[in-house]
């Protein structure tokens, strides 16, 4: 959905149910920028952020805590999570970006001067989060008076940030420079932790000994809920200023003031009188404090865990719990047949670039064997090594092979959305063949332990609608390996936009020593080891007709990407390949029946040419050049969490190459 606001008019796109929030936001602009004329080009947070805040408050009041997820289709309404507008548009978006470490511009920045678009987008989410934190600090009733006074005082006027701050201090009768300086002028984050909770008994009186730590640089007053053994709860307020910022109920206990900022005085302990032994403590049960790591906001050694079914489409992480998604899974191969099992995906606030305690894997029962099929992957960020740096481990055990890899990955970038950026990965991997009966006859695998050091460097660029990436992979055997070899490959992919889209891929590889056949790069596609790691191929060997596999009709993208029938039995010393393809749809749209058949079926035609020049182990060089056409259709029926799949048929005719024959191939993945 997309929309634009005008006084007494909104222009909106999209459909149900997403348009509800969009419409609410654009209508909200009639108050903030329409009636209260803040200058969006100067300080956008007064416009977009205030509108985001009132949109969340109004929508959550009208539709409840599922206001942002009004699903209508059966599957979505049954299995998708229900979330509030406050969560979707404010808390989640701000917290994810703040956790990345790339928030470099404070809210109090001219709209034209933000480092990148993602930093600018914080004027929406972070501002609304700031106002919810102000509500938490002053109390809901006081903040309502602040907003009403600000609105009425600057109706049809042009206020600036200092005007709102002055109103907030006047209405609340509190000095709030400490609050607004943190939220508007800095990029520091809020992160508190409960480090210890003990139950004490002194002279027949019960006390809760509570220890806290401020891990982030931002300071805020704290509301903490204590749960007692007798079932009662007690609220504790820890002020950070000389005077409480809000009125508290008489039943609340006001603890001593916690004075501290940045790393100064970042620990705190208090003894709270209670009526019964304490069993649990929780920071901010209202969920308004934008603490970027809430797993330690609850006492105990094991953090809260949210067990839920995996709908395979939409994931909204729980802000105050570790998510575990479960679903059934299965695999199929020609030896074991059907292998049922369970798949899990877990982590804290998972996203595309910062995955904390991310674990994913499956356990399947092999019907023809006593041992299970197991896959396990784990990664977590290591912040002291730099933004977007993760360590990872990957383990696989199947009837065909077993492998284990451990390493680290880091991205070097100027921002989340900024190009170019670099991706560097270093790992150690070990693998071995368990049984050759799982592979098709044309695949050559060798028994023995393969142990290697792997280095990878990727460079990614974008300009306009064109994108590209260049990836260098280096692999060398290490002690303990039964094979002594070295391998270097360079892969480039450039997706260019002219009058027709033009995709150009190049592959260059060099290898020496006793390269295991399953690791060796190939003319027709990816290496055998990389191929069997693709679930669709591993299962397809038993599902597709024998003619498909025995005659190379199944194409695994990679390597030289040749589609004509050209099988070599000896290893290659080096290879250079160029793959060029284009989608000629714009030329075909005027053909009779194109819209009714090709376009309606969502089929994408491709025209491609491939050139390969290589040397085999006998020092013989050969060249093959082919051309062909293909048809590709997205398999949208498969949930995106299972991967991006297509149905692809390519037909190739050799133009030059003495041993090549025309051929057709089938695949469930794109060429590149």
Where are the predicted features?
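Outer-envelope beta-barrel architecture signal
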Residues: 322-326, 336-340, 353-359, 372, ...
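Solvent-exposed loop/turn segments connecting transmembrane beta-strands
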Residues: 156-157, 329-342, 347-354, 360-374, ...
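Outer-membrane beta-barrel strand-turn architecture
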Residues: 138, 172, 332-334, 348-351, ...
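Hydrophobic alpha-helical and helix-loop surface patches within well-folded domains
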Residues: 1-221, 225, 229-232, 281
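Outer-membrane beta-barrel initiation region
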Residues: 232, 270-273, 284-384, 414, ...
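Solvent-exposed beta-strand/loop surfaces of large extracellular or lumenal domains
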Residues: 232-267
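C-terminal outer-membrane beta-barrel translocator/porin domains of Gram-negative envelope proteins
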Residues: 330, 387-399, 403-410, 421-427, ...
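Outer-membrane beta-barrel "beta-signal"
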Residues: 628-629, 661-672
